[in-house]
Design a protein with these regions (language model features):
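Acidic interaction surfaces
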Residues: 1-98
Length: 98
């Protein structure tokens, strides 16, 4: 399988696009990321976003299928978690959401 717009596949790109580029989704994600990281830290884990966290958050915001048909089952959740951790780092560095 090839890449799509720099992401592992179209579904991964599409889910992150909806999280990053739709105002309501972006605000929801930015509100939740620090809370998820804190919950992980408080439970003795690293204060990061794990694959399961990324999947759960994206499913809450986007759903199991995007409006144009990308399926959650096709998403590389590790890649989404990595992107969310980058956003979380930027939020910490610059304060609040960026």
């Amino acid at each position: 399988m090839g890449t799509y717009e720099g992401w592992k596949n179209r579904a991964t790109w599409n889910y992150m696009l909806r999280l990053n580029n739709e105002h309501a989704g972006y605000r929801a994600m930015c509100n939740e990321l620090p809370l998820i990281a804190k919950r992980n830290r408080d439970s003795g884990r690293n204060a990061i976003i794990y694959k399961a966290d990324a999947m759960q958050l994206a499913l809450q915001i986007v759903g199991i299928i995007t409006p144009d048909g990308s399926r959650a089952a096709d998403v590389d959740w590790g890649e989404i978690a990595q992107a969310m951790n980058e956003i979380l780092r930027e939020m910490k560095r610059y304060g609040g959401d960026h």
